[in-house]
């Protein structure tokens, strides 16, 4: 897939498809549903975004230990909960109505990435069965 010229913004779906193709070696030949294919793309995108953030922030997410890591995730959850409260806890409705770049979807992505970091930390410690 051709890359966009400088100044052109790649659509999110195109980015995800490109990332999936780049990461095709990780996939099996078993057919996957559309939602699982999107999950695979998001995993690749999250790893890329976490890599970028690590260059700037290092491992500051766990600087204050497990309690700090938990509180960081809890703050993101609190932000999401506050945003869905006005939509009778309908997260899809809240997302449909809040299309801002810094809106609820951004908080969901941040929380997912924090949880990835926590999971990866625990896997790296060998303290959980994978």
Please give the residue ranges for each predicted region.
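Intrinsically disordered, low-complexity regulatory regions
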Residues: 2-130
